Structures are given as C-alpha cells and as structure tokens.
Amino acid sequence: MTQDKVLTKAATDAVHQLHEADVLFAITSGRPPRGMQMLIDPLDLHTPIAAFNGGILVDRDMHTIEQKAIPPDLVGPVIDLMKSFDLDVWLYRGADWFVTEPKGPHVDREAWTVKFDPSVVDDYDHLSDQVAKLVGVSDDHDAIQKASEEAHEQFGDHVTAAASQPYYLDVTHPDANKGFVARYLAKQYELDEAEIATIGDMPNDVLMFAHSGLSIAMGNADPQVKRAARRVTDTNEKEGFAKAVERFVLPAARQQPG
C-alpha cells in the first residue's frame, strides 16, 4: 500500500498473477482484523489473515482461528513503560480498539486507515485480560526506538516489541510476531520455509524475513530492514510490491519443481 494506505491497481494485479501461478498469498499486519477486512475481496484472499502481527488469525469471514494475548500481569507494566517515554497508549482487545486520548496523535489517521473508530475509556485498569496488542504512539521517533529497547530490556522474551511504523511501537504476546506467522503458514500448508517469500518495510517484518527463503525489503524501508533482506525492491510509492512479485517472486516460483 502507498504512504496514504491506498491499495493500487498494480499491487492488486500482482496478487492475481500469484493466484494464477498457483502461488499462495497471505497478509499479516499490525492492524486489527477489521482493519484488514477491506483487502479480502480485492485480493481474493482465502489464506488465514494474521492481524496484530500474528496475535489473532482469522479466516475471510472474520472467524477466529487462533489468538495469543499478552500475559495479563504484564499489561500494566508495559503501559507504564510506554508512558514513561511520553507515548500515548492504545489497547486492542478482541475486535475492539480502546484509547484514552481521542484527540491524541494519529488517532484520526488510524481510524481512517482501519475504517472504524476507537472506544474512549478513562483508563485501562479493567481491560488487562485478552489484550492482543498495546501500541505506544508518538511523533518523537527516538522515543519510540528507546521505548522499544527498554521493553526488550525489561520484559525479555515475555513479549514481542517492535515498531510497525516510525511512530508506533507494537507490543504483543511473545509468539505474536510475523516470524510466527511465517512458521504457522509453513506448517499449515506443509511448506519448507525455503519455499516462502516475504515482502515488508518495517522493523516488525525482520522476524518474518528470518523464516523465508526469499526476503524482500521495500525501497522505503529503513537501512536495518534492508540489510535483513535478501533483495530490495522499489518504494511503496513506485509500485515496489508489484515489482517485487514480477522480478523476484514469480521467477522463483517458476523454478520450483512440479
């Protein structure tokens, strides 16, 4: 998708070329399930849809296949850590999105992106069970990076913490990450990880790269994301996804036996 979160015709056509070549196509995102629903029909998706970076997997009818929640006893401490870096905090639970500051940074943009509005609450004290994702939000990108590093330091392997955008820090269950999604799909479809191609542009895509034979970074990705990938395509404003499918994925698929 473009910087303005628009699904282009070239990207849609590229996915349909994958279908025609009998290449399975799946999507994973930090978005909630409802925030990915608008992609199902245009992309003719029939594979599991991995929302919240793998925190919830749903089918095309939005029925839950699998769900992984943040340990309830860590929800409060993670929120406190985010606040210590002056991040606004969003909480996702099931299909719902909660905020305490409806006029906070990026709330309106996120509502436009996911096509639904958040529920406004005074605090999150009563919402510690079944939390799929916590998001720290700030336009201070250094604060996002430092909060991510501190989350790794404080919580270790008990959560996954990674930036899904320069201004978003996503915290999820330790197995709710895009690496888990790649492993899950490999098992589901009896594939070797070497047969999987992944395309991404954010730090939360790096774990996914590690579990695929062909990893492709978008041209708009940060340098560390590009270094983690085997190939680099054009930017999302210059049809980088469609070019990656044409230049890398389809030729690799044609070389597969059978």
Predicted segments with their positions:
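Asp-based, Mg2+/Mn2+-dependent phosphohydrolase catalytic module
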Residues: 211, 216-258
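A generic structural signal for well-ordered alpha-helical segments
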Residues: 18, 82, 152-154, 225
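Short, structured coil segments at secondary-structure junctions
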Residues: 43-45, 52-53, 60, 155-157, ...
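Active-site phosphate-binding/coordination module
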Residues: 4, 9-107
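Conserved acidic, metal-coordinating active-site core of Asp-based
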Residues: 85-211, 220
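Residue-level signal for inorganic ion chemistry
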Residues: 18, 29, 53, 134, ...
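Phosphate- and divalent-cation-binding pockets in alpha/beta enzyme and binding domains
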Residues: 35-38, 146, 181, 207-208, ...
